[in-house]
């Protein structure tokens, strides 16, 4: 998968959050957008996922054969883990994973039980998500990002709400997807992207 952004900008009321964004992103590479809080990292990631429309410029998703994807279909090819994305709290963990698998398969045809083991939450598999701690919810979000069989993975502030053990778990697994997928991060914590090949400051897009 290839993502191309050309002269992309996003404006809220009278303020440009990012502007003049030009990117050429490829599967097999990892990219981290860095900058202080409020600098536009999350906005840029949301633009690239299609969650929010650009005020100017164009973003294209291209298959390996060069075919351009319609924006309505981008979601099939990406997964996003972010603090502002909510899990369905009325589901148990088992129900949530089974629901997710209806829309996006897991790698190696992993089952819900495999997922629960991967995120180290087997004892909580029948617990409602609403009763999970913030750290447990973050593990679930990251687990879905790591295991979903899609070409593009977005991670926004990936160690948010994780303790030291959870951060080590993240670092152990994020490196396993680098090289085989297109990995895009938003972060101001160097430990979150120490593996990353391409570091891009959002201050360049002002």
Question: Where are the regions that the model predicts?
Answer:
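Conserved structural motif at the start of ABC-family nucleotide-binding domains
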Residues: 3, 18-20
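The feature captures the beta-strand-to-loop junction immediately N-terminal to the Walker
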Residues: 34-36
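Helix-to-loop junction immediately C-terminal to a conserved catalytic motif
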Residues: 49
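Conserved ABC transporter NBD signature motif
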Residues: 57-69, 73-74
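Q-loop/switch helix immediately C-terminal to the Walker
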Residues: 84, 89-105
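Conserved ABC ATPase "signature" region
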Residues: 109-125
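Hydrophobic anchor residue at the start of the ABC signature
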Residues: 142
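Catalytic Walker B motif of ABC-type/P-loop ATPase nucleotide-binding domains
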Residues: 153-157
């Amino acid at each position: 998968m290839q993502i191309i952004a050309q002269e992309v900008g996003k404006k809220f009321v009278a303020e440009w959050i990012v502007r003049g964004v030009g990117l050429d992103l490829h599967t097999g590479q990892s990219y981290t957008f860095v900058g202080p809080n409020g600098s536009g990292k999350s906005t840029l990631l949301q633009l690239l996922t299609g969650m929010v429309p650009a005020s100017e410029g164009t973003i294209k998703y291209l298959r390996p054969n060069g075919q351009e994807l319609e924006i309505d279909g981008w979601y099939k090819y990406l997964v996003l883990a972010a603090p502002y994305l909510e899990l369905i709290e009325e589901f148990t963990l088992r129900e949530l994973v089974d629901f997710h698998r209806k829309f996006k398969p897991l790698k190696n045809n992993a089952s819900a039980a495999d997922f629960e083991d991967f995120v180290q939450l087997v004892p909580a598999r029948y617990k409602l998500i609403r009763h999970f701690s913030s750290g447990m919810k973050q593990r679930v979000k990251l687990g879905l990002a790591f295991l979903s069989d899609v070409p593009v993975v977005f991670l926004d502030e990936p160690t948010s709400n994780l303790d030291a053990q959870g951060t080590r778990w993240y670092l152990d697994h994020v490196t396993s997807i680098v090289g085989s997928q297109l990995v895009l991060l938003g972060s101001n914590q160097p430990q979150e992207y120490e593996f990353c090949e391409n570091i891009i400051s959002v201050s360049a897009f002002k």
